[in-house]
Amino acid sequence: MASLNKMQLIGNLGADPDIRYMQDGTPTVTVSVATTDTWKDKDTGNKEEKTEWHRVVFFGGLAEIVGEFLKKGSQIYVEGALRSRNWTDKEGNKRYTTEIMAKEMQMLGKKQDNNKVGNARHGDALPADEDDYYDF
């Protein structure tokens, strides 16, 4: 049976991107992207909103573009796939996270200073061995 793992977000960066490099030299950026849902409360008539934070990981050329052209508050469109991973931290605690592995990105909103690239696509966002994609 066929399946689909595709995420699409339009949101704002919660912090300035920080480019890091894997052992093989591949650039990577992990950012938190905020999305906000708004609705009218049917009992009070008040406008309500809820913000969700999404971890998004960029690799290679996409990571370089995000690191160079985006900053806290930048609005972006991201398309990618959900990936979950777990690990044991330095204190021995079992940790778990779910992230969006970005395959496409488009900058939205106001034009940033030095913003020369409007959208980008990365044909193979993950390294060949996914188990190694966080080795720094």
UniProtKB/Swiss-Prot annotation:
GO terms for molecular function: single-stranded DNA binding. GO terms for cellular component: nucleoid. Residues 127-136 have a biased composition (Acidic residues). Keywords: DNA-binding, Plasmid. Residues 109-136 are annotated as: Disordered. NCBIfam families: ssb. Homotetramer. The gene is ssb1. This is Single-stranded DNA-binding protein 1. The keyword DNA-binding applies. HAMAP family: SSB (MF_00984). It holds the Pfam family SSB. Gene3D superfamilies: Nucleic acid-binding proteins. Residues 4-109 form the SSB domain. InterPro entries: NA-bd_OB-fold, Primosome_PriB/ssb, ssDNA-bd. GO terms for biological process: DNA replication. It comes from the Bacteria.
